[in-house]
Amino acid sequence: MARHRVLVSAHRCGYAELGTVGGHEDPLAGVMHSAQVGADYCEFDVRRCADGTFVVAHDPDGGIGDASVVISDLTWDQLCESAPDVCRLDRLLDALAATGMGAHVDLKFRTPAAIREAGGTWEVDLASVMVEHIDPAKIVFTAGVRTTTMSLRAWADEHAPGMVVALSIGGSVRGMTWANAVRRRWSEVFPQHRFRRSNSDAVAAHFVLAMVRLARWTTHIGVPLLVWTVDSGWLQRRLLHDRRIWMITTNHPARAVALRDG
């Protein structure tokens, strides 16, 4: 029997392991680093400018520490003036395609209801750009919004059936009432209904949820499980040799690959 091989996705294109380049986060340098250490995928957050330009940025302000700068409110030209180090998506995809690694895309926007009612789907616009650069079989989308996962899966079924759409489960309950926080956590441990309604074909779960129940559940229903964010050495050792896990996302891809392949 072939040995099970858990895939490794470099969180933020390996930013934490590589460190800053020139005083700022450099996803292009991160892609090169992640490829050199043997990662299978690069994870990155995609945001949408007001003019429809897609950019790679973990933070809403592009990482400059100014809350008055909001990527979604600015055109690409305006963003360049305020946060000149933000990388356009197409530049990153060209660099990623040259390495042969896959793209793990975390959506940081959603299509407004009015736009969706008029027939627009920003997530489908993004998917259309992605498949121009990357083999659809090497694209994974993670999102926690049902309308987003449904529209992505519907589009992929027709245009890119190999693309994976994963429902993201887990996250902060900060600011919620106690009762709402309990309901949220319960729905994360027992997400069957939410998953069915999402039309997703994979699950992306926080490592605690994966270990408590979701690894067993996803194996039972036969869908891939992506686990985030797996950083400690002992946790990497455990999950990288768990046949129930499809992929882990980590800030330390070099160590993860060494533990898996060593």
Identify the residue ranges that each predicted region occupies.
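Phosphate-group recognition and catalysis centered on beta-loop-alpha active-site segments
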Residues: M1-G262
